[in-house]
Amino acid sequence: MPAHLRTGIAGEDAAFFELRRKGYTVVARRWSAGTLDGDVDLIAWQGPMLCFIEVKTRTARDRTPAEAAVDRHKQYVLRGLARAYIRHLPQGDPPPTRFDVISVYLVPGEKREFMHFENAFGWN
């Protein structure tokens, strides 16, 4: 497996455990609708709020923060995936939702760092 994929998986794993530590209930990892491009890294409940979470991982610090990689196109893809996921929920009013981004820094020789951006972008 290429190094960048191993790094991404390590970051998603770290974010998963950090969310659980914070009391989230993670219900899906790397969820894909099958027909749409991409996947949602983590889907979790924080109380009544359904959170669609994109994780960006870096092993070095550069000028551009990791969360900046969630550009307009990625946001568009995540919105489509969220709609598909919500359609699979039991009938009734859709739950309140939000889109979060978690930046994970796994820099050798440094303590692991998380930056959690709740409600990083919306439905529009």
Regions found by a protein language model. Name each.
Residues A15, L36-G38:
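N-terminal polybasic phosphate/anion-binding patch
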Residues V104-N124:
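Short, low-complexity, polybasic intrinsically disordered segments
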Residues V40-R63, L78:
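Conserved catalytic cores of phosphodiester-cleaving nucleases, focusing on short active-site segments
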Residues M1-R30:
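Acidic-basic catalytic patches of nuclease active cores, encompassing PD-(D/E)XK
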Residues V26-A28, F52, F99:
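Hydrophobic residues on conserved beta-strands that form the core of alpha/beta folds
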Residues P2, G34, T57-P108:
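Catalytic cores of nucleic-acid endonucleases
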